[in-house]
């Protein structure tokens, strides 16, 4: 009776010690940082990759991906000459390690939909409105650089870093494309008439 009770008590105590010991360690994956929550409160300290000690059942570690992430966004805007422009923007960005805790606390894990996508929409509209539809085609690199700079200014304050910015496509309405084609045909006919 008594001996069996001591053995069972010893097994329960040993199991408890093992459970506490196993919950005292956490591992942060490569390319990630660990945000420490103590009773749900975000700590300013951010854990680097590797094995770390934590207070079992009191601290929780949230892994934030600090690798380069890709976002592709479709935007609709108007050019300076009021042409509707549909564009596709692709960018690579990452969360800076030191900003992981602040982003998790202020924005949460959905920073792409909360910060990145709206900022892209706003930057594309602001820059596109400065140029005519024709300039959007002929000055594409300059426009891309302006959009990238504006976007980087917007997202860097949150601890996000813009790596690569690309305008995948500028597309115009069928009516505008037909008008451009008609203009080119007229120019070619005029040039041909001059030569004849």
Regions found by a protein language model. Give the residues of each.
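Single-pass alpha-helical transmembrane signal-anchor segments
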Residues: 2-24
